[in-house]
Swiss-Prot record:
EC number of this enzyme: 1.1.1.62, 1.1.1.64
Active site per database record: Y198
Gene that this sequence comes from: HSD17B3
Primary localization: endoplasmic reticulum
Reported effect, M235V: In MPH; almost complete loss of testosterone 17-beta-dehydrogenase (NADP(+)) activity
Outcome reported for the amino acid change (mutating N130S): In MPH; Cambridge-1; complete loss of activity
UniProt name for this protein: 17-beta-hydroxysteroid dehydrogenase type 3
Reported disease: Male pseudohermaphrodism with gynecomastia: An autosomal recessive disorder that manifests, in males, as undermasculinization characterized by hypoplastic-to-normal internal genitalia (epididymis, vas deferens, seminal vesicles, and ejaculatory ducts) but female external genitalia and the absence of a prostate. This phenotype is caused by inadequate testicular synthesis of testosterone, which, in turn, results in insufficient formation of dihydrotestosterone in the anlage of the external genitalia and prostate during fetal development.
Pathway(s) of this molecule: Hormone biosynthesis; testosterone biosynthesis; Steroid metabolism
Naturally occurring in which organism (per UniProt): Homo sapiens (Human)
Length: 310
């Protein structure tokens, strides 16, 4: 019995060491890619002629649209506000010389995908950025006290990722080439009290993306999920930027350095460090009543001080 226990503890120790080593390797690769930018400039362009970006009217989606156009791709912008799309398209064409198509669609609805499919027909799509999403409550809130937007959130945060991937992945598979970036969130990495619906919806994006990567990596299609923490956008009420909170432009430029790093990344070095720190917090402490009270008092005060929330 003693020998069995000894072998068990040795094996457990080895597994823990391997897990720590894997995290160190991932972190080291992030540092290397961030500071030395070893991704060839032609890599993204080699995926195909067009990039499709959902939620392109603001924030991260808008930043991806500009950055991918700057890197040589034509872009398809999809969002619900036509005026924003037209203004962004004009600016991209003027500053980059790339071709731009716009598709007006409201991702909180589920009857939009035939229209999108028709508009995308015939395009050689090399990159899909599933960015569109909604956060019903920026301020932490108990589930029953949060805005009743459950169906809209499911359509926007979950259905959009599945349906857009279904539309475009089949063509990438046949071409044996493509890149799909699914924008999740750092709070998807473990359940977050007081952000229950948003956290759960983004956890779906993580699980779906990782499973697809395993299914299609032999087809030379890269499917990566990004799990950023704070990015200053309209959805986060333009949270004041700092060493952790990035502008959308900063986040996007850095995240594109990591597209070959693996199936999951936080998208920027600062957020990788934050994720590592949060993973050290014991579950009993994270899910304690004291932590929830901390969110409801100090974190709310921080948000009100550093955003346009009042």
């Amino acid at each position: 019995m003693g020998d069995v226990l000894e072998q068990f503890f040795i094996l457990t120790g080895l597994l823990v060491c391997l897990a720590c080593l894997a995290k160190c390797v991932r972190f080291s690769r992030c540092v290397l890619l961030n500071y030395w930018k070893v991704l060839p400039k032609s890599f993204l362009r080699s995926m195909g002629q067009w990039a499709v970006i959902t939620g392109a009217g603001d924030g991260i989606g808008k930043a991806y649209s500009f950055e991918l156009a700057k890197r040589g791709l034509n872009v398809v912008l999809i969002s619900r506000t036509l005026e924003k799309l037209e203004a962004i398209a004009t600016e991209i064409e003027r500053t980059t010389g790339r071709s731009v198509k716009i598709i007006q669609a409201d991702f909180t609805k589920d009857d939009i995908y035939e229209h999108i499919k028709e508009k995308l027909a015939g395009l050689e799509i090399g990159i899909l950025v599933n960015n569109v999403g909604m956060l019903p409550n920026l301020l932490p809130s108990h589930f029953l006290n949060a805005p009743d937007e459950i169906q809209s959130l499911i359509h926007c945060n979950i259905t959009s990722v599945v349906k857009m991937t279904q539309l475009i992945l089949k063509h990438m598979e046949s071409r044996q080439k493509g890149l799909i970036l699914n924008i999740s969130s750092g709070i998807a990495l473990f359940p977050w009290p007081l952000y229950s619906m948003y956290s759960a919806s983004k956890a779906f994006v993580c699980a779906f993306s990782k499973a697809l990567q395993e299914e299609y990596k032999a087809k030379e299609v890269i499917i990566q999920v990004l799990t950023p923490y704070a990015v200053s956008t309209a959805m986060t009420k333009y949270l004041n930027t700092n060493v952790i909170t990035k502008t959308a432009d900063e986040f996007v430029k850095e995240s594109l350095n990591y597209v070959t790093i693996g199936g999951e990344t936080c998208g920027c070095l600062a957020h990788e460090i934050l994720a590592g720190f949060l993973s050290l917090i014991p579950a009993w402490a994270f899910y304690s009543g004291a932590f929830q009270r901390l969110l409801l008092t100090h974190y709310v005060a921080y948000l009100k001080l550093n955003t346009k929330v009042r």
